[in-house]
Amino acid sequence: MFVHLLVLLFAAVEAIPTGRFEVVYPSMVTFRSGIKRIRFRALDEDIELRLEPAGDVIADDFTVINGENGEVDHSVNIQSLKRKLYKDAKVGAALHIDEDGSLIINGIVNSKLRIEPDTSKKASRNGIIAHRVIEVIEDEQLFHDVIILPPGLTRTFNYSEPLPDDKCVKIEYVFVTESSFTKSFQISSMETYLANMMNMVKIMFDSLDLGIEVAIIGIIKLTKENEAKLAPYIPLCSREMDSRETLDDMAEFYCNSADKLIQNADIVTLITTRPLGTFDENGYFFNIHLGIAFLDNICVYCYKYAIVKEDTGIYQLANTVAHESAHLLGCDHDGEKGSLDCSARDGYIMSWNNEKIGKKFSPCCKKRVEELITRRKINHCIVETCDGKRKRN
């Protein structure tokens, strides 16, 4: 079905837990503006976050699908989830803050620290329960990134006319969680985890300065019981997942699907923790891929798909989701084809070595995305009339 394959080597900066953590009792103040200030000291570092509401990454009609036959889970309180999401874009924090009872904070503090409630501590201090602040380090590892060029793709590199001021760009996601990923959330909430992850993706997209909004409209939770029925494109006989073959089968399956959730999504992404890579001619598997996506096809129904691997946690997952989404929006790797003017050594998200500026997109990627969103024949799924809160500058 798909004939062109680009495999490019890049050094992914991953967040690896160091084993260091400290128990803290964070203080929080909420101002009239809705901004929350959180302070604590951990691992010899004074932390102060100024957090703004960030519930827009969850759609008002957010839908969770699970169960043997893919039923809608009506137990999810959408407005409660949205109300508890906050971010500090300046430092790269994305948190779920639960004040229904004792204060519970969960999520990303910055690129080096995570916070979660400490369930081993029963006592509280001045009504504040204990939290663990966990240190992670950035570890450079080599992985391959895969881009598939659908047959008949004709790429242009010219601007069209700018978007009218009353038009905004919003990318709506559906995440399909492969059973190994779903299983890891027997205790903690997947919805909270993916919402915090999506806020990190939003912070990364903000570096494009194009006013792009992102939102999760649905999660399809796969389990061992429903995976074969709801996602027959996922291999059953082998734990290893051939990235190209799986994406090919995934696209073909959903291309013929009448599922309204899939139809309404701008990007459909499979999340897995299984080994993702390729087999050689002797059947040896190389576990070397973090992601795979179609290039320049966000609004093409049969090609709006990607696969990402969660390898070392939420920050790496956010980076990979942003990276593969940018491919669908038309971005090449820095230093390649449409991004020749940006060196891969600069270290942006789309470079082979993103340890320097790994939270931002390069000027070349911005140019390609800007070209896509101004091409009326291509941008129809992500450009919409702005609401009162989202007027473009």
Swiss-Prot record:
Post-translational modification: Contains several disulfide bonds.
Domain Peptidase M12B: 167-377
Disintegrin-like domain as annotated region, ranges: 378-393
Cofactor note: Binds 1 zinc ion per subunit.
Cofactor(s) needed by this chain: Zn(2+)
InterPro entries: MetalloPept_cat_dom_sf, Peptidase_M12B
One example of a Gene Ontology biological process annotation: membrane protein ectodomain proteolysis
Gene3D superfamilies: Collagenase (Catalytic Domain)
The keyword Repeat is assigned to this record: no
Matching Pfam families: Reprolysin_5
Signal peptide: 1-15
Localization in the cell: Secreted
Any one Gene Ontology molecular-function term assigned to this protein's record: metal ion binding
Functional summary from the UniProt entry: Metalloprotease.
Protein family membership: Belongs to the venom metalloproteinase (M12B) family.
UniProt-recorded name of the protein: Venom metalloproteinase BumaMPs1
